[in-house]
């Protein structure tokens, strides 16, 4: 274990994952802590996250990412984390689901350099890092799932990514407060499939997940 990661961090991750109903193997646990160590190290120079205190990163980044894993369905194999930033939730998704293809996209070169380093050091062969504005990204095929965490408004999230999915794609928007005001401006061809209030161990404040689809 890196000297940047403490036994308390390891215990908080294990306990929080159990509370979320997420089963972590020893390899999952090791790689998530390895990711945490890289995040702590690189954040000092690269400003990857506004969370400066390493003791807050387990709950606010790792467990927050794990809180949506039960909504990542097995039949959906090709995922995009748009506006990934420091890699949440894309890196935890790639760690927990090594047989799924996960793409993390960000327009900030420093952040994509960090994500590339994470891919190399943790040997995440299922991870693809893309340095691009989302509107300019042209994948070879639609994604099965598109997820974002505090990326933009619901209107922008759906409009900017509509060309990256189709009517079979699920869009997952991770939000803090319920975005009722944003849903009013949701494009007419998108519909909310479900809404979930999430409880993240160690995190204060509201968390919500909205799952959307495009109408046929």
Swiss-Prot record:
EC number: 2.1.1.170
Main localization (coarse): cytoplasm
GO MF, any single term: rRNA (guanine-N7-)-methyltransferase activity
Alphabetized InterPro entries for the sequence: rRNA_ssu_MeTfrase_G, SAM-dependent_MTases_sf
Residues the record lists as binding S-adenosyl-L-methionine: 83, 88, 134-135, 149
Alphabetical keyword list: Cytoplasm, Methyltransferase, rRNA processing, S-adenosyl-L-methionine, Transferase
Catalytic activity: guanosine(527) in 16S rRNA + S-adenosyl-L-methionine = N(7)-methylguanosine(527) in 16S rRNA + S-adenosyl-L-homocysteine
Domain of life (superkingdom): Bacteria
Annotated SUPFAM superfamilies: S-adenosyl-L-methionine-dependent methyltransferases (SSF53335)
Keyword check for Coiled coil: no
Compartment list: Cytoplasm
This protein's record includes keyword Iron-sulfur: no
CDD domains reported for this sequence: AdoMet_MTases (cd02440)
Record function comment: Specifically methylates the N7 position of guanine in position 527 of 16S rRNA.
Family: Belongs to the methyltransferase superfamily. RNA methyltransferase RsmG family.
Name of the protein this chain belongs to: Ribosomal RNA small subunit methyltransferase G
């Amino acid at each position: 274990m890196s000297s940047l990661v403490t036994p308390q961090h390891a215990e908080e991750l294990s306990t929080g994952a159990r509370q979320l109903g997420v089963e972590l193997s020893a390899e999952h646990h090791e790689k998530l802590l390895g990711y945490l160590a890289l995040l702590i190290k690189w954040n000092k120079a690269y400003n990857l996250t506004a969370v400066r205190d390493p003791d807050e990163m387990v709950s606010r980044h790792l467990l927050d990412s794990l809180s949506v894993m039960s909504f990542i369905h097995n039949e959906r194999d090709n995922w995009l984390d748009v506006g990934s930033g420091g890699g949440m939730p894309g890196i935890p998704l790639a760690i927990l689901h090594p047989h799924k293809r996960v793409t993390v996209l960000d327009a900030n070169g420093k952040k994509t350099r960090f994500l590339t380093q994470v891919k190399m050091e943790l040997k995440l062969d299922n991870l693809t890092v893309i340095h691009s504005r989302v509107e300019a990204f042209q994948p070879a095929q639609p994604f099965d799932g598109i997820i974002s965490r505090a990326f933009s408004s619901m209107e922008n999230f759906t409009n900017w990514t509509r060309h990256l999915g189709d009517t079979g794609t699920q869009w997952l928007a991770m939000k803090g407060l319920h975005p009722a005001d944003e849903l009013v401006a949701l494009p007419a061809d998108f519909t909310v499939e479900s809404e979930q209030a999430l409880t993240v161990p160690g995190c204060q404040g509201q968390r919500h997940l909205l799952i959307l689809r495009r109408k046929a």
